[in-house]
């Protein structure tokens, strides 16, 4: 998931942009005037010619999600923003989201046009997440779900997950020994998730240097595709030629490095036994000869790089940040941590490690993770939707091609849906109390993984990773604040996902 708008609002130079756009004001104003006569868009703040609401957002000095939250209070559950050349229709009501993405899911299942930088890295939208609703998307998603993310296939990777959990615990113990019990939570959690996904993706073991290099490259890619002002005002693109050149350099580095790993797997398949670390199956294996509807050719090397990068990015940071927020809540609520540990002990005793079969029996752990995903979804907005053809919603026109954004906290913290929504309370999900179908099929109450046809295909895998990782970490360690007695700062900031503004460092005390 990429951030919706993450450039600094204070970085906009108003005089510069005023000069740039002055020659276009008359033409664009007339065009907008004619458009408004044709369309009945949802309400929203009046904007300036050409730039729309960009200046208002910049002058607010707020992150985009806070700006959207303020507008929701003024304009209601569906409103319009014009951010330069992009029109955004933002939904923050559970009923409207259910109508759009579930009841009328096929119509709202496409994606809008990408900016030029992102197109470089997506191979012109050749990914499960970015592809327009159609044959390419169907082919890519069907392959990923059936061959990698089915319940049967996920079970086959059980030993890999257990091995990764053992290594995670050893890494935490080692770091704690070297730092008087103090560890970085996010760094360790995302490394464990990344290692699992690397082996699932490529089917070969890698040394730590290779793992860290791959991680570094993918992080650089994510920073490179971060939105810029010229994504919203393409007329400014000539002023960002250095950034485009840098993006092409990053892409070349990504392709060159990842293709080397791809070729290693290809050789292992062609020469069985030549790579002693090679596993019997990987995601990459399913892509080599993948048939795409409407195409005669199989994916190119560059497309393989794109699809593998999507697989890795999609599950690394979402899992890592969920664990960081989860440990933070356990530290802030020691009574919850005690209940979770007691449930683990009553389920597995003192003599063995928690495994995935145990996790399925832990009612309080299940409730804790649901509440974690409700209170701390991976991002503030779901991936952007677009309608296949102009339609209406709530009596307003929704034109084809506009960005349809779903503001997640508007639903997961709606007091009409949740009792005391600001409170972190796993008991709300215990038997006989509140519940939520995170797929959204029976009703939208929380959508940490999206809903409808474009729901995250890795939902089941992600929840397995989060449940198992939390259970092992709590079984092995008591988690305490650093410095002792200090309060946890739950302020967040948007990077690739919503992370803690002040990264969590925690004290650990081994239990067993």
Swiss-Prot record:
InterPro entries xref list: Cyt_P450 (IPR001128), Cyt_P450_CS (IPR017972), Cyt_P450_E_grp-I (IPR002401), Cyt_P450_sf (IPR036396)
Compartments, record wording: Membrane
Any Pfam family = p450
- The UniProt annotation places heme binding at 456
Q: Name one GO molecular function term.
A: iron ion binding
Q: How does it sit in the membrane?
A: Single-pass membrane protein
Cofactor(s) listed: heme
EC numbers listed for it are 1.14.-.-
Q: Which residues form a coiled coil?
A: none
Keywords of the record, alphabetical order, are: Heme, Iron, Membrane, Metal-binding, Monooxygenase, NADP, Oxidoreductase, Transmembrane, Transmembrane helix
| Residues spanning the membrane | 9-29
Q: Which PROSITE patterns match?
A: CYTOCHROME_P450 (PS00086)
Single GO cellular component term = membrane
Q: Among its keywords, does the record have Metal-binding?
A: yes
Main site of residence?
membrane
Q: From the UniProt record, give one GO term of the biological process aspect.
A: fatty acid oxidation
The family classification in the record reads:
Belongs to the cytochrome P450 family.
What's its job?
Catalyzes the epoxidation of physiological unsaturated fatty acids in vitro. Can use laurate, oleate, linoleate, linolenate and vernolate as substrate.
Its name, as the record gives it, is: Cytochrome P450 77A4
Give the organism the record lists.
Arabidopsis thaliana
């Amino acid at each position: 998931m990429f951030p919706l708008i993450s450039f600094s609002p204070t970085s906009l130079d108003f005089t510069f942009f005023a000069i740039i756009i002055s020659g276009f004001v008359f033409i664009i104003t007339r065009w907008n005037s004619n458009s408004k006569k044709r369309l009945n868009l949802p309400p929203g703040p009046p904007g300036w010619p050409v730039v729309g609401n960009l200046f208002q957002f910049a002058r607010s000095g707020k992150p985009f999600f806070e700006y959207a939250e303020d507008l929701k209070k003024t304009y209601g559950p569906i409103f319009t923003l014009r951010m330069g050349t992009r029109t955004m229709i933002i939904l923050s009501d559970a009923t409207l989201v259910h109508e759009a993405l579930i009841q009328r899911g096929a119509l709202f299942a496409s994606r809008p046009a990408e900016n030029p930088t992102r197109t470089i890295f997506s191979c012109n939208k050749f990914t499960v997440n970015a592809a327009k609703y159609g044959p390419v998307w169907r082919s890519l998603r069907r392959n990923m779900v059936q061959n990698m993310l089915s319940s049967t296939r996920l079970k086959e990777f059980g030993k890999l997950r257990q091995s990764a959990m053992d290594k995670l615990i050893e890494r935490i113990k080692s770091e704690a020994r070297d730092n008087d019990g103090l560890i970085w939570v996010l760094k360790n959690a995302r490394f464990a998730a990344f290692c699992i996904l690397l082996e699932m993706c490529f089917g070969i073991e890698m040394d730590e240097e290779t793992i860290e290099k791959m991680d570094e490259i993918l992080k650089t890619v994510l920073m490179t595709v971060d939105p810029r002002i010229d994504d919203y005002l393409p007329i400014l693109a000539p002023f960002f030629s250095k950034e485009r050149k840098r993006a092409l350099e990053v892409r070349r580095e990504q392709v060159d490095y990842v293709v080397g790993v791809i070729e290693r797997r290809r050789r292992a398949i062609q020469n069985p036994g030549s790579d002693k670390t090679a596993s019997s199956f990987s995601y990459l294996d399913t892509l080599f000869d993948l048939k795409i509807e409407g195409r005669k050719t199989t994916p190119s090397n560059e497309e393989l790089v794109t699809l593998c990068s999507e697989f890795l990015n999609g599950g690394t940071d979402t899992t890592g940040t969920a664990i960081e927020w989860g440990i933070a809540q356990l530290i802030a609520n020691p009574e919850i941590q005690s209940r979770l540990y007691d449930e683990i002990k009553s389920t597995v005793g003192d003599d063995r490690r928690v495994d995935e079969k145990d996790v399925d029996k832990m009612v309080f752990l299940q409730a804790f993770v649901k509440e974690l995903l409700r209170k701390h979804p991976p991002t503030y907005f779901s991936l952007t939707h677009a309608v296949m053809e102009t339609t209406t919603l709530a009596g307003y026109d929704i034109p084809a091609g506009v960005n349809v954004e779903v503001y997640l906290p508007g639903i997961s913290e709606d007091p009409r849906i949740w009792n005391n929504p600001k409170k972190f309370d796993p008991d709300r999900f215990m038997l006989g109390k509140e519940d939520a179908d995170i797929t959204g099929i029976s009703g939208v109450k929380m959508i940490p993984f999206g809903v409808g046809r474009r729901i995250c295909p890795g939902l089941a895998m992600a929840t397995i990773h989060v449940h198992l990782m939390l259970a092992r970490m709590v079984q092995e360690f008591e988690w305490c604040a650093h410095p002792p007695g200090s309060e946890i700062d739950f302020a967040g900031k948007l990077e690739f996902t919503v992370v803690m503004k002040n990264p969590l460092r925690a004290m650990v005390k081994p239990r067993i």
